[in-house]
Amino acid sequence: MPVAVMAESAFSFKKLLDQCENQELEAPGGIATPPVYGQLLALYLLHNDMNNARYLWKRIPPAIKSANSELGGIWSVGQRIWQRDFPGIYTTINAHQWSETVQPIMEALRDATRRRAFALVSQAYTSIIADDFAAFVGLPVEEAVKGILEQGWQADSTTRMVLPRKPVAGALDVSFNKFIPLSEPAPVPPIPNEQQLARLTDYVAFLEN
């Protein structure tokens, strides 16, 4: 049976991941239940473990996949992650009605994606159009701008540009309630609107290589 999600913390999610992996290993005939597969697949995505996520998706029996649409929904989120489609990640997560055992994991994944996007923008840009920034962090423009102002960033209402503050190692992210991993990359000059999200996607690829 699936493991109940008791607390939304990094420790509890790691413990839950270990439990789900053990349940799959100990399952009769090596075939786990759909809820266990769902939790395990979502947890691999949460931990950005795309290799294990892909291997798990391949070994889930086709009959279980076809009979449990939630598994396909989780994997569709994984495909957006694989494509580094940040706006698509939020859209796909929000488009599904998740089960109570998967919902907390997907909410944590959405929040982790948002924090990662926030950190990437702070590292990669000296300025970015507010609408593009909002799409990248998956928030309404007004809410996104409010959050960055609380972080000490600047926003120009006339040009609708957001001006990230240069990261300071160990800075606490109050608005998103997490520490954001920071580094000291060279600043990147502004680029045209239509290239913003593509440039951010390329920057993600650069960091991961």
Swiss-Prot record:
One of its GO terms (biological process) is protein neddylation. GO terms for cellular component: COP9 signalosome; cytoplasm; cytosol; extracellular exosome; nucleoplasm; nucleus; perinuclear region of cytoplasm. Transmembrane segments: none annotated. Residues 8-179 form the PCI domain. InterPro entries: COP9_CSN8, CSN8_PSD8_EIF3K, PCI_dom. PROSITE patterns: PCI. It comes from the Eukaryota. The keyword Nucleus applies. It is found in: Cytoplasm; Nucleus. Keywords: Cytoplasm, Nucleus, Phosphoprotein, Signalosome. The modification Phosphoserine is found at residue 175. It holds the Pfam family CSN8_PSD8_EIF3K. Its main location: cytoplasm. The keyword Lipoprotein does not apply. Component of the CSN complex, composed of COPS1/GPS1, COPS2, COPS3, COPS4, COPS5, COPS6, COPS7 (COPS7A or COPS7B), COPS8 and COPS9 isoform 1. In the complex, it probably interacts directly with COPS3, COPS4 and COPS7 (COPS7A or COPS7B). Belongs to the CSN8 family. PANTHER family: COP9 SIGNALOSOME COMPLEX SUBUNIT 8 (PTHR13339:SF0). Component of the COP9 signalosome complex (CSN), a complex involved in various cellular and developmental processes. The CSN complex is an essential regulator of the ubiquitin (Ubl) conjugation pathway by mediating the deneddylation of the cullin subunits of SCF-type E3 ligase complexes, leading to decrease the Ubl ligase activity of SCF-type complexes such as SCF, CSA or DDB2. The complex is also involved in phosphorylation of p53/TP53, c-jun/JUN, IkappaBalpha/NFKBIA, ITPK1 and IRF8/ICSBP, possibly via its association with CK2 and PKD kinases. This is COP9 signalosome complex subunit 8.
